[in-house]
Amino acid sequence: MKTAIFKKPGLIAVEDHPKPTIQQPTDAVMRVVRACVCGSDLWYYRGDSEHGQDAIGHEAIGVVEEIGDDVTTMKPGDLVIVPFAFSDNTCPHCENGVQTA
């Protein structure tokens, strides 16, 4: 799959990387349909913040391709949104339904 890799300020390369696979029973694999550049991606690109040579981009929409055995809230073919923040679903904010607080 194609992946945007931050190399250094001012340089992002598109490289081929292996497709993700289910590693845990709670995992889901999504095919990205659209992705966007976030303001924090621009921090690295402009050199305002440090970032190793790694994949960038963390806001996207896509289609679920595969789910782990413990996943019950989605199924293959569902359209999903990747939020800008990750949630653990165990903290007080998550338990109150505000996962990105």
Residue ranges of each PLM-predicted region?
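Extreme N-terminal starter segment of soluble prokaryotic enzymes
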Residues: 1-2
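Residue-level recognition of beta-strand termini and adjacent short loop/turns
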Residues: 8-10, 24
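Short acidic/polar mixed-charge low-complexity motifs
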Residues: 10-11, 70
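Short glycine/threonine/proline-enriched tight-turn/helix- or strand-capping micro-motif at secondary-structure
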Residues: 11-19
